[in-house]
Amino acid sequence: MEIHILDSETIAQNVARTLTGNYWLGDLSSSGSLIVHYVGRSDTCLHRRLKEQAAKHKWEAFSFRPTDKFCLPLKEAFDIECREYHLLKPRDNKMHPDAPSGLTNYSCRYCELEANLSSAPVDEGGVY
C-alpha cells in the first residue's frame, strides 16, 4: 500500500469521494515506512473520514485500502479493522472497533479466537 502525507490536498488527489474502506494513520520512520498509531474504517466515505482525521493534526501520514464493492464491504472493512487492531495494537485506538450499524449479530472473529485460545488446555510442555 502506498503511504501519503496526511493533508487535505493529498487526500483530494488520492482518495475518491465514493470509496469506503480502511485506513492507517501514523508517522513516517526515517526510512519512509508508516509507523501505525491508529487504524480505522469508513462505512460511508473514506475521503471525508480522512479529512476529519487530518484536521486533528495528530498524525503525519496515512495509507488506505478501499473495500471491494462486489463483496460484503461492511463485513470486509470491519474484519480488516479488527485484524489490524488486534495485530498492531495501535497506541491511539482507545477502544475496540464497533461493528457497523448495518450488521446485526456480527462480532469480531479475532476476539472469539483469543477467547478460544485462552481457554484451550495446555499440556505440560506448553504446546496447545
What spans do the regions from the language model cover?
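Boundary/linker segments flanking structured domains
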Residues: M1-H37, R41-Y128
